[in-house]
Amino acid sequence: MSVEKMTKVEESFQKAMGLKKTVDRWRNSHTHCLWQMALGQRRNPYATLRMQDTMVQELALAKKQLLMVRQAALHQLFEKEHQQYQQELNQMGKAFYVERF
């Protein structure tokens, strides 16, 4: 074998070894990642439940707040329409009967 062929074979061997090391590192990190995920799932079930409970409470409060905002907007709309209706009746010379106590 010539020196050039030996250097080419040696270079390809070095590339193959580098690729093998990269694959081994990836495999080890993947295994470690899976292990960490499983460990985290086993370690924190109560934290997950607390977060879910907190999310449920926040959603309930958000729904209640949205309901209150919508009710206030509807009340304002009814008041505005009532005022407009009163103005139209006043222009025609009519009025609502308002009982005073």
From Swiss-Prot:
Keyword Cytoplasm: yes
Residues annotated as signal peptide: none
Family annotation (Pfam families): CFAP141
GO cellular component, one term: sperm flagellum
Localization terms from the record: Cytoplasm, Cytoskeleton, Cilium axoneme; Cytoplasm, Cytoskeleton, Flagellum axoneme
Role: Microtubule inner protein (MIP) part of the dynein-decorated doublet microtubules (DMTs) in cilia axoneme, which is required for motile cilia beating.
Record protein name field: Cilia- and flagella-associated protein 141
Protein's organism: Homo sapiens
